[in-house]
Amino acid sequence: DGHKVLLCHGSPWDLNYYLYPDATYEVRSRIERTDVDIVFFGHTHYPIIWDDLNVLSVNPGSVGQPRDRSPGACWAIWDTRENNISLKREIYDLKNIIQACKKYDPNDKYLQDVLTRE
């Protein structure tokens, strides 16, 4: 539909930069320096939609390691014709995932801890 899109891990200016939901406007406005209509970024696992910039900016969240203390998978749907974006959630049974983690590597508690954060 003619949109210029940038996909990046951390931010448009640094692969490993953390763009958190509470980022200042000064930091967020750096996204406007890109020559695109929409930026999708990740790294923090926090779902974000910033529509107050000249560039629509979206972190779709995380399917397996949510950091916003909301259970389940989070992702974004982008309607390119309407240029409308929405975040979606799907709750899933963590017990099965945690059991699989324990079976695969019983000594690695990191992923188990991430999945059960409150």
Where are these regions (language model features)?
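Short acidic-hydrophobic surface loop/beta-edge motif
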Residues: 1-2, 50-52
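Conserved catalytic scaffold of divalent metal-dependent phosphoesterases
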Residues: 1-38
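Active-site neighborhood of phospho(di)ester-bond hydrolases with catalytic His/Asp-centered motifs
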Residues: 8, 38-43, 57-61
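Active-site environment of divalent metal-dependent phosphoester hydrolases
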Residues: 13-15, 38-51, 65-70
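Generic secondary-structure boundary/loop-capping signal
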Residues: 16-17, 45, 60, 112
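Hydrophobic transmembrane alpha-helix bundles
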Residues: 28-37, 41-43, 76-87
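Acidic, His/Gly-rich catalytic cores of divalent-metal-dependent hydrolytic chemistry
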Residues: 51-118
